[in-house]
Amino acid sequence: MAHSAPLGLLEQGCPIQVEHDRKRRQFTVRLNGCHDRAVLLYEYVGKRIVDLQHTEVPDAYRGRGIAKHLAKAALDFVVEEDLKAHLTCWYIQKYVKENPLPQYLEHLQP
C-alpha cells in the first residue's frame, strides 16, 4: 500500500508529496504531473535491516530540496518501523550528517 505525505512545495505552490510503495521498496515524488519522478530505492538486507541504496532526481529538478524530502521520508520510515538502516546512498549519508537527529542515529547500522 502506498503512503503519501505532503512536504514543502514544488512548482507554483504545488506541494511535494512523497509516496511510499512498500511492494516496490521505493519512495517517490511525482514531478510535472506523472511524466517525471524522483525516487529513493531501498532493499531489505536482513530481517530488520534496510539498505537505503540510491536517490535520483531528474536534472531539471535538482537543487529544489526534493532529495531531502525523500531522505526524510525514508529515515522516518526506518524509525517508525524500528528498523536498522545501512546507508549505501551518498546523499542519505550527507543528509544524516547535516541532520544528526538522535532518532536517526539510533537506527543506523554500525
UniProtKB/Swiss-Prot annotation:
What is the protein's species of origin?
Gallus gallus
Gene behind this protein:
NATD1
Per its UniProt record, what InterPro entries does this chain match?
Acyl_CoA_acyltransferase (IPR016181), Gcn5-rel_NAT (IPR045057), GNAT_YJDJ (IPR031165)
In this record, what's one Pfam family? Acetyltransf_CG
Q: Which family does it belong to?
A: Belongs to the NATD1 family.
This protein is called Protein NATD1
Q: Where is the N-acetyltransferase domain?
A: 19-109
Read off the Gene3D superfamilies from this record.
3.40.630.30
Q: Which domain of life is it from?
A: Eukaryota
